[in-house]
Amino acid sequence: MKTKVINFYGGPGSGKSTKAAGLYYKMNMAGFSVELNNEFAKECVWEDNVPMLKDQLFMLAHQHRKILRLVDKVEYVITDSPVMLSGIYRELYNGPLYSDLIDKLAKECYDKYDNINFMLDRPKKIFNQNGRAQNEQGSIDIDNAIIEMFKSEKLPFFWLKGLEEEAVDIAFKYVAKKGSKEQWGKYLF
């Protein structure tokens, strides 16, 4: 079994964690071999350790380890903190601590898996700063940087729009279309 990684992309406050958890719930309840990896960066923010976010080598290693330990144990890993975000965040915190070799290392980690990439449409609601290092404008800037990264790296992605439940249903159907007919057939309609 080759592990597939389902990546939820978007700046802080875009709904990555909520939609990733929703897709995990839906796939798990349908009987699929799936695990949810949470965002290590958010753990750092909750611990008031925002300076740790500057060390993107550490952040990348920690986040990738969460995926690597599940390889060949589950068919799907869902993450709200894709490894490719290390290249985006490496420049944000008072200049880069590392060179663009971090970007290359992140791409090497990314290329180890079959990836499904969802870019989230930013919800039209009041931005909640709680648990985030960026403000709303900083988060929108990250959204834009992610789109540029998709283009420059030529990474395929599906733009996921809609309210929480609707977006989770769309993601579920999209993943189903990427899976085998035997496994997903009854979920496609």
Spell out what each predicted region is.
Residues 1-3:
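Phosphate-binding P-loop
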Residues 8:
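Hydrophobic anchor at the beta1->P-loop junction of P-loop NTPases
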Residues 12:
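The conserved Walker
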Residues 16:
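Conserved lysine of the Walker
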Residues 21-65:
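Conserved substrate/cofactor phosphate-moiety recognition/catalytic segment
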Residues 38, 79-81, 120:
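Active-site flanking residues adjacent to catalytic metal/cofactor-binding acidic residues
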Residues 49-98:
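Conserved nucleotide-sensing/catalytic segment adjacent to the nucleotide-binding pocket
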Residues 93-173, 179, 184-188:
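A glycine- and Lys/Arg-enriched "phosphate-lid" helix/loop adjacent to the NTP-binding pocket
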